[in-house]
Regions:
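Pre-Walker A (Motif I) flank of P-loop NTPase domains
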Residues: 1-6, 93-94
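P-loop (Walker A) phosphate-binding loop of NTP-binding proteins
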Residues: 9-11
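ATP-binding Walker
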Residues: 14
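Walker A/P-loop
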Residues: 17
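Post-Walker A helix-loop "phosphate-sensing" segment adjacent to the P-loop in P-loop NTPases
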Residues: 25-33
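ATP-dependent small-molecule kinase phosphotransfer cores
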Residues: 37-96, 102-106
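A glycine- and Lys/Arg-enriched "phosphate-lid" helix/loop adjacent to the NTP-binding pocket
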Residues: 39, 43, 90-95, 107-162, ...
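NTP-dependent small-molecule kinase module
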Residues: 156-258
Length: 258
């Protein structure tokens, strides 16, 4: 069975790392490519688990050596995917999941147009701001300038949603995990004829509902909230002025995600 290459992208704080972790608990045969980065480890992150950490000089030597399938600079740090991850997954007959930003995803799609691409959106700027603030608190400091910068960057990244085949809105974790699982199983069914047994019809329906081409009505409130759908065609950011007390009441189970 030929493995499938899945790309998953999302603004920082959208919860994609949690989604990927939950998916791998429930679906076998999905390898995860541990990205390389030059940013400093956060909290309990360990080399080789969440990321492979390298100095900027080491990373640039790896670029020159052709180590990476894709790489990009995001928020002042390099991130990249080693080609070896894809070779190892193919040798094992496994699917491979790449957790990469929109720049890296564009590079991979250009080289491998058969890849399945998935974009994860936060439900609105207020929830995203809460997650980013809570992550900053967990690191010992709340940097409002950095939070606002990432909110602005999120709107820019969301503008790229049309480049992805599937769209998830991570408002309810269990539902988003079920949707991600359905996408993987449906793609296996369509591409490899892999059986999904009695769940087949429901799985295919859930996956189809997440297709970007079928998601416009569902996505409009999110796009409007992030200013991607301005009435005059201009980006209209609406991050709100909610207090910290209101922020603390938001769902924060994905606070530590990139």
């Amino acid at each position: 069975m030929a493995g499938i290459l899945f790309i998953i992208s999302a603004p920082s704080g959208s919860g994609k790392s949690t989604l990927v972790s939950e998916l791998r608990k429930q679906v076998s045969g999905v390898d995860f490519s541990v990205s390389w980065t030059t940013r400093a480890p956060r909290g309990s992150e360990a080399h080789g688990r969440e990321y492979n950490f390298a100095s900027r000089e080491e990373f640039e030597r790896m670029i020159e050596a052709g180590v990476f399938l894709e790489y990009a600079e995001v928020f002042g740090s390099y991130y990249g995917t080693a080609r070896q991850s894809l070779l190892d997954a193919r040798a094992a007959g496994h699917d491979l999941l790449l957790d990469i930003d929109v720049q890296g995803a564009a590079q991979v799609r250009a080289r491998m147009p058969e890849a399945v691409s998935i974009f994860v959106m936060p439900p609105n700027p207020r929830v995203l701001r809460t997650r980013l603030r809570n992550r900053s608190r967990a690191e010992g400091v709340v940097n409002e300038e950095e939070v606002y910068r990432r909110l602005n960057e999120a709107s820019k990244e969301i503008e790229n949603y049309r480049e992805y085949g599937y769209i998830l809105v991570n408002d309810i974790l269990d539902r988003a995990v079920a949707q991600l699982e359905a996408i993987v199983l449906a793609e296996r069914f369509y591409r490899n004829g892999e059986s999904i047994a009695y769940r087949s019809r429901r799985v295919l329906e859930v996956a189809a509902a997440c297709l970007q081409s079928n998601s416009r009505e569902r996505l409009n409130p999110v796009l409007e909230a992030f200013g991607v759908l301005g009435s005059n065609g201009q980006q209209q950011l609406n991050f709100g002025q909610d207090s910290d007390e209101e922020d603390s009441n938001d769902d924060s189970e994905d606070d530590n995600d990139d």
